Amino acid sequence: MKLLPELKYSKDHEWVKVIDGDVVYIGITDYAQDQLGEILFVETPEVEDTVTKGVDFGVVESSKVASDLISPVNGEVLEVNEKLEDEPECINEDPYENWILKVKLADVAELDTLLSDKEYEAGLE
């Protein structure tokens, strides 16, 4: 299982990458994509929608199951990765390169409530 130390993680298997101050990418972890199997479809919110920490913002459908995407932060959706519409399986190929949402955080301090790579990994054991 691949984890990146520069990312923050949620117990719900999402990762957060700070790209510019209060702007982040959100995606699912390598562990999550492995558990899901081949990803067939990703349902996402619209640009300018609000995401709420701990609340689902979309669904990932795979060959095995449909699973809710749970937001690790509060914020406003700035962009949705349009590549996922035609190539949702790209998440299986590289879950950390193929983000789902670009979000402007409501509060940067929320990042401190997320897990480090080591804490996330320990929670899987």
Curated annotation (Swiss-Prot):
Cofactor remark from the record: Binds 1 lipoyl cofactor covalently.
Gene of this entry: gcvH
Highest taxon listed in the record's lineage: Bacteria
PANTHER family: GLYCINE CLEAVAGE SYSTEM H PROTEIN, GLYCINE CLEAVAGE SYSTEM H PROTEIN-RELATED
Keyword Coiled coil: no
Residue numbers carrying N6-lipoyllysine: K64
Family per similarity comment: Belongs to the GcvH family.
GO biological process, alphabetically ordered: glycine decarboxylation via glycine cleavage system
The protein's role, per its UniProt record: The glycine cleavage system catalyzes the degradation of glycine. The H protein shuttles the methylamine group of glycine from the P protein to the T protein.
Gene Ontology CC entries for this record: cytoplasm; glycine cleavage complex
Protein name per Swiss-Prot or TrEMBL: Glycine cleavage system H protein
Entry-linked InterPro entries: Biotin_lipoyl, GCV_H, GCV_H/Fam206, GCV_H_sub, Single_hybrid_motif
Quaternary assembly: The glycine cleavage system is composed of four proteins: P, T, L and H.
